[in-house]
Regions:
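Conserved, single-site charged/polar hotspot
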Residues: 2-217
Length: 217
């Protein structure tokens, strides 16, 4: 397996360093110094599990959750979820699943993929399971304005994919049944709706991640 270079993300919360590194990554992208995802033998898009936080990204734990899908609106409390078993799972919907109890910069978020509502001692958690490439269409515009140059958006897409792939392998949120959360602790996800330019950047770099020296290990 190729070793992935994650130096960019370790300094992610430092805006100045982040901007400087983005310039370097754009040069890398333009030079073609990236590699394809090494584990795509089945050609299947990897799945990622995202822990969704409350409004303003304040907490991982929700006291009450209201969802809307397929013409239904349902509110869940911890007691109601426990009556139904270990968790409530809402399968993926054609028009997505809207979580009315959360607000983001773009308004009430709508999520692709499935939603799981899981009771914990501190409250309810929400896990959104979806394909990695779909996830990236809501990460890239949340992390970088979609008005940026195309190569910058493509570099951001590759970086975001690389980071997400690493988190899937590391399972840092295993106890919460997730790979990442939707905050700056990992990557901001779902704060903005998909934007055409950002989605194109994800599509044009599909499966590409950063590698260290392009060597297998």
């Amino acid at each position: 397996m190729k070793r992935v270079g994650f130096f960019y993300f370790e300094e992610k919360n430092n805006d100045c360093r982040r901007q400087r590194m983005m310039k370097v990554l754009i040069v890398i992208m333009m030079a073609g110094m990236w590699c394809m995802q090494p584990e795509k033998a089945s050609a299947a898009d990897p799945v990622i599990r995202v822990l969704l936080t409350t409004t303003d990204f304040n907490s991982r734990y929700h006291q009450e959750i209201t969802v809307s899908y397929d013409g239904k609106e349902i509110t869940y409390t911890a007691e109601e979820v426990k009556k139904q078993g270990d968790k409530v799972r809402i399968p993926a919907q054609k028009d997505g699943i809207r979580i009315l109890s959360i607000q983001r910069q773009s308004g009430t978020p709508v999520y692709d993929g499935s939603i799981e509502i899981i009771p914990k001692a501190e409250g309810l958690i929400i896990v959104n399971e979806l394909f990695l490439e779909k996830y990236l269409t809501r990460v890239v515009p949340s992390e970088m304005p979609a008005t940026y140059e195309k190569e910058a958006l493509k570099a951001q897409a590759v970086c975001a994919r690389t980071y997400a792939w690493k988190q899937i392998q590391e399972q840092r949120l295993h106890e919460l049944e997730a790979d990442v959360d939707d905050t700056v602790n990992f990557q901001v996800y779902g704060n903005m709706e998909p934007q055409k330019a950002a989605t194109e950047a994800v599509r044009e770099t599909e499966g590409q991640i950063l590698c260290q020296n392009g060597e297998d290990n």
